[in-house]
Every structure is written in C-alpha cells, then in structure tokens.
C-alpha cells in the first residue's frame, strides 16, 4: 500500500460520504418509508461505477491512484450497503414486508442495472 494510494482513497471517500450525507438530508424526508437519499446514492453510485469500469478498462495505463480515488474512495464513500441494511432491518422489524421487498429489489437490482447502463454508455462514448 503506497502513501499516494492511501491519500487517494481517503480523499475520495470523504467527498463521497459528504455527497451521500447531503443526499440523505435533502431526499430522505420526502418518503421516509423508502429513504430516497440512500436509494439515490446507491443507484447513482452504480451508474458511476459502470462509467468508471468502462473508462478505466479503456485507459488501462492511467495511474492506479486515479482508480483508487474514484472507484474505491469516492464510490465506496457514496454508496452504502450498511445504511441500506439498517433501513431494510427497520422495515422488517415494523413488519412492512412489501416495502422490504421493494427496497431490496430497488437497491440490489437497480444498482446492478445502473452499473450495466453506465458501462454501456461509456462504451458507446469511447467508440466515437
């Protein structure tokens, strides 16, 4: 582990976490049963991960610190499996099983689909 990689991950994670916090403040009060800030962070993070996968797959010679900054740091700080898990556990404890299913599907399937969309979009951009 290099010092530059350590700094890249830390800086990216801080910015990603700040954005996730801002999304939670802005969007979670709109529909508390399915906190939209958390969902937005995970869907946006999935899409950005797809873009990054396509970009870094194409430009393999870029410094590894760029990948660490964006993918490991920023997107790791932005997306949140732990908050999603806590929100899902809360839905289950309140016996809101329908909303639990909606939440799990939206986060898991939605994030994977957004990653695929992001990768496809970057692939189209890079083919131009």
Language model segments and positions:
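Membrane-interface helix-loop junctions in multi-pass transporters/channels
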Residues: 1-128
């Amino acid at each position: 582990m290099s010092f530059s990689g350590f700094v890249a991950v830390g800086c990216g994670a801080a910015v990603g976490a700040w954005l996730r916090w801002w999304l939670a403040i802005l969007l979670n009060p709109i529909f508390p049963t399915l906190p939209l800030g958390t969902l937005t962070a995970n869907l946006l993070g999935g899409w950005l991960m797809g873009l990054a996968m396509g970009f870094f797959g194409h430009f393999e010679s870029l410094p590894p610190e760029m990948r660490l900054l964006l993918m490991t740091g920023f997107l790791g700080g932005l997306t949140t499996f732990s908050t999603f898990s806590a929100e899902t556990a809360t839905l289950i404890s309140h016996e809101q099983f329908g909303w639990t299913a909606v939440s799990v599907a939206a986060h898991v399937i939605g994030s994977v689909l957004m990653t695929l969309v992001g990768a496809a979009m970057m692939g189209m951009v890079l083919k131009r």
